[in-house]
Each structure stands twice: as C-alpha cells, then as structure tokens.
A protein has these predicted regions:
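N-terminal export leaders
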Residues: 3-8
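C-terminal motif of bacterial Sec signal peptides marking the signal peptidase cleavage site
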Residues: 19-21
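Bacterial signal peptide processing site
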Residues: 23-25
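A short beta-strand-turn-helix
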Residues: 43-62
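Short active-site neighborhood of thiol/selenol oxidoreductases, capturing the structured segment around
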Residues: 56-74
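Conserved helix-turn-beta segment immediately C-terminal to the redox Cys motif
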Residues: 79-100
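Short, internal strand/loop/helix patches
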Residues: 114-161
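Thiol-/selenol-based redox modules, centered on thioredoxin-like
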Residues: 152-196
C-alpha cells in the first residue's frame, strides 16, 4: 500500500513538472504553424554534389527557402537577412543551416549554387535535383513557381514564394516567415529552437 506521504510527494512532483512546463512556454515572433507545417522531408543534391535528405541536417535548426540565383531582388535580400540572423546568433549559429532550394535547376548548376550560397553564409547550402524532386518538395510546402517568358537573350524570371520555413533540430515544422520578417524576429525564434 502506498503511504499518504508518498502520494503527497508524487502529487507535489507532478505539480512541479507541470509548472516547469508552463515556464517553458515559447512566445514566437514569426507565425507558429507547428500544427499544419509538415516535417522536413526531401531527397535532393547539395551544392557540393552529395545526395542529401532531411536526415542529413538532423541536429540543426533548418531554415528552408525556395529561390533562384538569377533572382534580381527578393531572393538576395532574403538570403542576406537569413545570413545576418545566423551571424547574430554568434557561436550558436553553427547549429543552423539555411537550405536554399533552387526552383531553376537549368541555370542553377552546382558550381553556381555553391558560389551563390557561400557568398551569403558558410551555413547556407544550395539544394537542387531533378524537376520532379524539386516539385515534390515544393508541393509538400505548398510552394508554387512558374517561369516567365524568355527575352531575346534567353533570360527569364521565375515567380515563386517568398516564404521561409523553419524546422526544429529534430525536423519538426515549426515556424513560417517571409522576406518581410525582421532579422531580430528570426534571431529571437531560432534562438528558442536552438535551446530546445
């Protein structure tokens, strides 16, 4: 038979754990979409030519962003903000990866992707693959993209999403932001994910 004292001790511990859980409640600056954002999942090729999956980045907070290297405005601005956020995290930034998925694999060859991502941050990785692989990942995160008409020189723009998706160290879909999200907000939220 369990003594009354043991029951009281167990009850006290339960209350303490519940209160500790309440104290850990997170307040996000970006949109918390953990109930609807799918976990990180893909099969692509990194800008170093390695076949990679979401498992390749387990243990890191992953920031997923779709774009292309010929993008004239939104992509470089967003990548710059993400890189600045990683830098502002200080030493903890080594546990973050910016995963830049190219929606323009015809022009974004591995060397082009590598030069582009590394110009922003050593924690950035360019990802590419077959069009089917890219479309699979885009569809998973409801990212639409389409190609503009080629000009006389063969150049074209790609209309795509400006969303950024942030995943916890175990790959859980957690937050969504955009090219309008402030560096301060990204740093604030990623720091919380790193602490988990």
């Amino acid at each position: 038979m369990i003594s009354r004292r043991a029951l009281l001790a167990a009850g006290s511990l339960s209350v303490a754990f519940a209160l500790a859980g309440c104290g850990k409640k997170q307040h996000w600056d970006l949109d918390n979409v953990s109930s609807v954002l799918p976990n990180l999942q893909f099969h692509l090729t990194s800008d170093t030519g390695q076949k990679v999956t979401a498992e390749s980045y387990r243990g890191k907070v992953a920031i997923l962003y779709f774009g292309y290297t010929h993008c004239p405005d939104v992509c470089p601005l967003t990548m710059s903000h993400l890189a600045q956020a990683v830098t502002e995290l200080g030493p903890a930034g080594k546990d973050v990866r910016i995963l830049f998925v190219s929606v323009d694999p015809a022009r974004d060859t591995l060397p082009v992707l590598r030069a582009y991502t590394q110009a922003f941050s050593p924690q950035a990785v360019g990802l590419t693959g077959t069009m089917d692989q890219i479309q699979d990942v885009a569809k998973r995160y409801h990212v639409a993209f389409n190609y503009g008409k080629k000009d006389q020189y063969g150049n074209y723009v790609v209309d795509d999403s400006a969303a950024i998706y942030i995943f916890s160290k175990d790959g859980r879909g957690t937050l969504i932001g955009s090219d309008q999200s402030s560096v301060k907000s990204i740093v604030h939220d990623v720091r919380q994910l790193l602490a988990d």
